[in-house]
Amino acid sequence: MSAVLCRILSIALLVCAGAGVAAAEAKAVTNSIGMKLVRVEPGAFLMGQDGPAADYNVKKHAEKFDDADWDEKPAHRVTIRAAFSIGATEVTLAQYRQFQPKHAGGRGSDDDAVTGVSWNDALAFCEWLSKKEKRTYRLPTEAEWEYACRAGTTTLFHTGDALPESFHQWPADIGLRDRFFPEDKLPQEYRPKSARLSLRVAQTPANAWGLFEMHGNVSEWCADWYGPYEAGEQTDPLGRSDGDFRVIRGGSHSMQTRLLRSANRTAWLPETTSEKTGFRVVLGEWPRGKMLSPALPALNAQNVSQTIPKLQMPSPDMPFFSGPKPFVIIPPNSSGPLYSWHNHSPAIAECPNGDLLAVWYSCVDEAGTELNNLASRLRLGAGEWEPASPFWDGADINDHAPKLWWDGDRTLFHFARGQLENIVRTSTDNGATWTKAQAIQPMSEIGNGIIRTREGVIVMTQDTTSTSLTLSRDGGKTWTFTPITDKKLMHRSGSPARHAGIHAPIVQLADGRLMTIGRLNTEAEQAKFNMKTPASFSSDGGVTWTHEPTPFPAISSVQRAVLMRLRSDSVPGAPGPLLLCSFTDISANAKKPTGMDFPCEGGTLHGAGLFAALSFDEGKTWPVRRLITPGGAPHTVSGIDRGQFTLSATSAEPPGYLAATQTRDGRVQLISSKNHYVFNLAWLKQLPPAPKK
């Protein structure tokens, strides 16, 4: 669309909107705190958006905004039977401070939309205002919100199939603006990059019913629990009866235009806050519709056995190896909630019932709002992993890098990076159901592996430079961390206050110290450790650290290592050696690897790719080293993101994020970003045959 045509369209929309606003003004009322509310008459509309599915390829066409998200389908007819009055604007800072005088959220002007309020805060405001005026104030239902937003339109926005010129704000490089739009000029619907951010309400034209900022400014909480749409006509829908997330609508400043569409849905934890999220209120009784039951559980949570098995313990002296077998099983060309393009950053845990549960994130773009968390279950006694199915996801939230941990008793833990916080959930029924998410700080990707020390402290590393570890001393009920306040110590290459590297797995050594290994991305960082993987040690619970290089090559992007304590294969219940799994070369060198020497029958072999090493002296030496491969003649195997690699006696999987657990049968369950390997200590110690010449 040309700039001239866009300008003509904008003028036409302003003229039409002006007529609608004039009609709405006659129906508006102002309440006791100066809030203008507009009466919305009953009616019907088409909720959601059908049509071509979004491909989410923001690197290719970040300006594209017209395709539908999977959770906006099917579009369905909704009838609103009763009139209601809704705020002409979002609740302002001045209005909210009559309820909470010390509230700090917002830009500071009385006419700014209030932000930094949780769904629970918004509900409390409505209850306060209801009591004050002896009338029912509440949040809009999701259906009421979209009905009011559309104001009789069926287009992508209430302004038509595009936003007017300079309607939307993205004035700072937050939300990856300059990654999506590296040029100085933004698409026509955005204000210039030089424009100053303003959260003032009523700064863009109202829709035909007199409502301002239904697209952008700040996003808005709705009353409903988030859940999938159902086909068929609905009357006064109230959403689901329960869920993990509350609905958020309208989009905010500093995000892609597609997230501002009338049909677009966002959802997140009701107790959390964001400086991009506020709310508007409805005056009127609750609709007389019915709530839908929660959606049926996904495949990974269906028919989960609750029996604690009597496991057959294989001989620890008999070498065992199996794999690789894919655990990421997704139909080709899937575009939500499962994605065929990028499946990465997995975690794995044994469940009390003997099942294996794997989780990972799935997306097109790793930074995209479409990113979802999926899971697959390998049921006890089954030979194959089940197809992937949704696990947990806040709509349009990049809830990144899930982790799993079993406490060895009844409880599974699920961790993830959220919007502005990390989250933790627990399950005591083998992952069939989970608690509501608990928000914890700091917000950061969690390292690769969670442990419980001999003192009973649950410990996990953090990728952020503002701390090193997050700890729980009460079994996961509460979490603490020691902040790093000296900026000179805030760097990922290691400091006296922080372990070296990111995605760091952690173990406790026999003398009580903590040990991590980490990934350093740049050559300059790697050079500090002689191009080797760094190890870090703490004798005071992660407050201070020392560092040294390991004997193993540095790894880089698309790679993550494992470090874990195995159980003894000779003394039941006793601690065994340390296991390290990593790669011989950085992923960029996968096609021309340097490789390493490995012991084999009659001497050594030179190989490259995924390997394992054992230390029997708490990380001082690593005498056992073996490529993780079944050997045999070279053949092609699928790896991460539809890539392929050659598997042979001297060649193993080259990149991937590794995760591992040792199951009660003594076997190590190792996964990459695509594949599942199983082996035991006896196999690791066994010398492989010399390669055939």
Feature map (PLM): residue ranges:
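Functional-site microenvironments in short loops/helix caps that host divalent-cation chemistry
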Residues: 46, 51-68, 105-262
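Boundary at the C-terminal end of the N-terminal hydrophobic targeting segment
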Residues: 22-28
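Short, structured beta-strand segments at or near domain termini in extracellular proteins/domains
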Residues: 275-288
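Asp-box/BNR beta-propeller blade signature and adjacent active/binding-site loops
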Residues: 293-693
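Bacterial N-terminal signal peptides
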Residues: 8-18
